[in-house]
């Protein structure tokens, strides 16, 4: 799980320009990390590329926090 979290964190830091210390499992992309809807869509696309997976629109809508993303990726691998 640490490896997935590290990779997700790097993508978030690169995409949103936030401090790595702010990227916590419970952090909301929109409320805590300042992402807008387009940022979230782009994050999902980058996660798909990084982890070589397809995330359905229905599942993507459920990914609201860093922890949601990490748990989803772990459940699909």
From Swiss-Prot:
Post-translational modification (record): 4'-phosphopantetheine is transferred from CoA to a specific serine of apo-ACP by AcpS. This modification is essential for activity because fatty acids are bound in thioester linkage to the sulfhydryl of the prosthetic group.
GO biological process: lipid A biosynthetic process
Subcellular location: Cytoplasm
Pathway: Lipid metabolism; fatty acid biosynthesis
Residues modified as O-(pantetheine 4'-phosphoryl)serine: 37
Domain of life of the source: Bacteria
Domain Carrier span(s) in chain numbering: 2-77
InterPro entries in the record: ACP (IPR003231), ACP-like_sf (IPR036736), PP-bd_ACP (IPR009081), Ppantetheine_attach_site (IPR006162)
Example GO molecular function: acyl binding
Signal peptide per UniProt: none
Keywords in alphabetical order: Cytoplasm, Fatty acid biosynthesis, Fatty acid metabolism, Lipid biosynthesis, Lipid metabolism, Phosphopantetheine, Phosphoprotein
GO CC terms, sorted: cytosol; membrane
NCBIfam families: acyl_carrier, PRK00982.1-2, PRK00982.1-3, PRK00982.1-4, PRK00982.1-5
Main function: Carrier of the growing fatty acid chain in fatty acid biosynthesis.
UniProt similarity note: Belongs to the acyl carrier protein (ACP) family.
Name of protein: Acyl carrier protein
Organism (species): Bacillus pumilus (strain SAFR-032)
């Amino acid at each position: 799980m640490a490896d997935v979290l590290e990779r997700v964190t790097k993508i978030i830091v690169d995409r949103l320009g936030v401090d790595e210390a702010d990227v916590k499992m419970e952090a909301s992309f929109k409320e805590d990390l300042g992402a807008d809807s387009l940022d979230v869509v782009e994050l999902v696309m980058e996660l798909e590329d990084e982890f070589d997976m397809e995330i359905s629109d229905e599942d993507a809508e459920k990914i609201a926090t860093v922890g949601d993303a990490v748990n989803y990726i772990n459940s699909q691998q």
